[in-house]
């Protein structure tokens, strides 16, 4: 019997966006380089290599997020223990909404995500570094 998916990704993202702050791209660009903010790039490493990256953003692959946030886990990254605002982004703003929701539910705060993701960032003229491939 085929699987019956009861909740699609669009509904999940919509629900996440009701729980978290969504920052417009122009506002997010102003946060770059601030001492009180960490921009968290959750894209896959291949996306960074292909499309480039935001200078100074911390790269945390989406698949490792929960493990890197948990201070009791062996994969914990100290950046997630800092008293800062964590602003997540992906390529288009869908995965980052889910990531910010998960981070918030784990107790990380404050968190937000960038509307439009890296694509919106580039379109708005935000600073970028080229990919390596």
What are the residue ranges of the model-derived segments?
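Active-site flanking residues adjacent to catalytic metal/cofactor-binding acidic residues
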Residues: 40
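Rhodanese-like catalytic fold shared by cysteine-dependent sulfurtransferases
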Residues: 1-37, 45-86, 94-133
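Short, surface-exposed ligand- or partner-binding patches at beta-edge/loop junctions that are enriched
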Residues: 89
């Amino acid at each position: 019997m085929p699987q019956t998916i009861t909740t699609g990704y669009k509904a999940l993202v919509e629900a996440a966006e009701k729980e978290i702050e969504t920052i417009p791209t122009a506002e997010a660009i102003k946060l770059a380089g601030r001492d009180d903010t960490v921009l968290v790039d959750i894209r896959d490493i291949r996306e960074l290599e292909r499309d480039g990256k935001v200078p100074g953003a911390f790269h945390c692959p989406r698949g490792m997020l929960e493990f890197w946030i948990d201070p009791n886990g062996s994969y914990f990254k100290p950046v997630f223990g800092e008293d800062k605002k964590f602003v997540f982004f992906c390529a288009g703003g869908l995965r980052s909404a889910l990531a910010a929701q998960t981070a918030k539910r784990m107790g990380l705060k404050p968190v937000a995500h960038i509307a439009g993701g890296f694509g919106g960032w580039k379109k708005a003229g935000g600073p970028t570094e080229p990919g390596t491939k």
